[in-house]
């Protein structure tokens, strides 16, 4: 039996980055949309030094990244994506984004527009505990917290897992 799904290209998944710092957007772009050839070279070198076989390539995330630098801008993008029937599957949202609304308010209003979007809230600070965040947002099954500075592997793993989870819903 021919498995056609294996030969079809993976659909592009839409990920929204919401952060007031342009450098953070570039970091996400490097992590989530990277050419993995340098990672393959590192894996090969590691296997030569430490023994064993190099691990396979990172999964093809097939991601379209869209940037918003303030909460209100993010909400406009989410509204348009829903209206165009091309919603975001995942958003990485910073907590502090002066001078506008913060990440908690952004996420709350984002879920009013699109309750299916998966969210990773990102912060370098301890403004809110998990309990406060969960209580405030009331949708913790679609929420993960990522502490800055973030680890490349953790960001990719979160993206892979949450995008797969979105496809199951």
Language-model segments: residues:
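Alpha4 helix (beta4-alpha4-beta5 surface) of REC/receiver domains from two-component response regulators
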Residues: 86, 101-113, 124-147, 153, ...
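The short loop immediately C-terminal to the conserved phospho-acceptor aspartate in CheY-like receiver
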Residues: 91, 96-98
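Hydrophobic/aromatic residues positioned on beta-strands within the core alpha/beta folds
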Residues: 93, 120-124
């Amino acid at each position: 039996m021919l498995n056609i799904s294996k030969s079809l290209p993976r659909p592009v998944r839409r990920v929204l980055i919401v952060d007031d710092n342009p450098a953070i957007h570039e970091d996400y772009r490097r992590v989530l949309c990277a050419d993995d050839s340098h990672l393959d070279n590192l894996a090969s070198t590691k296997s030569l030094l430490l023994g064993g076989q190099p691990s396979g390539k990172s999964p093809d995330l097939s991601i379209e990244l869209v940037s918003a630098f303030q909460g209100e801008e993010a909400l406009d993008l989410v509204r348009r994506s829903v209206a165009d029937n091309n919603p975001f599957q995942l958003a990485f949202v910073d907590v502090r984004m002066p001078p506008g609304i913060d990440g908690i308010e952004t996420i709350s209003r984002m879920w009013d527009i699109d309750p299916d979007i998966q969210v990773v809230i990102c912060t370098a600070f301890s403004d809110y505990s998990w309990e406060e965040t969960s209580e405030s947002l009331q949708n913790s099954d679609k929420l993960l917290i990522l502490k800055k500075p973030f680890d490349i592997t953790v960001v990719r793993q979160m993206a892979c897992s949450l995008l797969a989870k979105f496809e199951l819903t």
